[in-house]
Structure formats: structure tokens, C-alpha cells
């Protein structure tokens, strides 16, 4: 009887461990490649000079604009960047696993910063 209980609890423990570790693992994707493709997309189709990078769990993306945007325009551009990276990563839950730091430069100055932490909404601030 004790041996059966021990075996039962061991099996339950192992199943729980597998389920928990499977749920917390980021999806298999190359986020660095998605960032690179997004960079190319904005340069070629939108004519926006930009640079992107991926470091551990944070995507960093800088856009250099020729005209100064409003806060609303900056927010729209940032959302376009997020959607494009998500599209190229082939995972609609990308932002449940990665943080994002964005900024917009105009005339050699950073004028807007955007941050989006895992599972949170995008926050845009003027500098």
C-alpha cells in the first residue's frame, strides 16, 4: 500500500513538473531574425532608417526620422514595429516572453522613448 502511494505521488509530481516547465518555456523562435527582418522592412518599404538588436530577453529598436512626429504618431510607429516583429516571429504571444525598448531620433536627438515589458502595455514618453 505504501509503495503504491509513493509511486502514485511520484507520477503526479513528474506530470506536474512537465506541465509547469512546458508552460513557462518561451516558444521556439528566432527573435533576433524577426528583429532583423523588421529592420529591413522599415528601411525598404517605409524609408525609415532604423537599427534593431536583441539582447537576452529584451528587443531594442531605434528609428531615425526626418520629420518630428507627434506622440500619437510615435505611438503608431511603435505599434507598427511591435506588430511587424510579432509577424516575423510567427508567434502572436511574442510579447508574453520579451521586453521591448524603443526610441525615435530626430536631428541627432532622441525625442521619444517607448517601453513594453512582458505582458504589459506599451508606454511612450517624450524626452
Predicted regions and their residues:
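Transmembrane signal-anchor/signal-peptide helices with a preference for the extracytoplasmic
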Residues: 24-29
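Short catalytic/binding micro-motifs of nucleotide second-messenger systems
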Residues: 85-89
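Short amphipathic alpha-helices in soluble, non-transmembrane regions
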Residues: 74-81
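Polar/charged, Gly/Pro-rich intrinsically disordered segments
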Residues: 32-46, 55, 62-72, 92-127
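N-terminal secretory signal peptides
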Residues: 49-50
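Bacterial N-terminal signal peptides that target proteins for export
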Residues: 2-10
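C-terminal motif of bacterial Sec signal peptides marking the signal peptidase cleavage site
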Residues: 19-22
Amino acid at each position: 500500500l505504501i509503495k503504491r502511494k509513493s509511486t502514485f505521488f511520484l507520477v503526479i509530481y513528474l506530470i506536474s513538473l512537465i506541465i509547469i516547465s512546458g508552460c513557462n518555456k518561451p516558444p521556439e523562435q528566432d527573435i533576433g531574425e524577426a528583429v532583423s527582418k523588421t529592420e529591413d522592412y522599415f528601411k525598404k518599404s517605409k524609408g525609415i532608417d532604423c537599427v534593431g538588436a536583441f539582447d537576452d530577453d529584451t528587443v531594442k529598436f531605434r528609428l531615425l526620422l526626418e520629420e518630428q512626429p507627434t506622440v500619437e504618431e510615435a505611438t503608431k510607429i511603435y505599434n507598427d514595429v511591435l506588430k511587424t516583429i510579432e509577424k516575423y516571429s510567427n508567434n502572436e504571444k511574442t510579447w508574453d516572453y520579451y521586453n521591448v525598448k524603443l526610441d525615435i531620433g530626430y536631428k541627432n536627438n532622441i525625442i521619444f522613448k517607448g517601453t513594453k515589458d512582458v505582458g504589459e502595455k506599451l508606454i511612450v514618453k517624450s524626452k
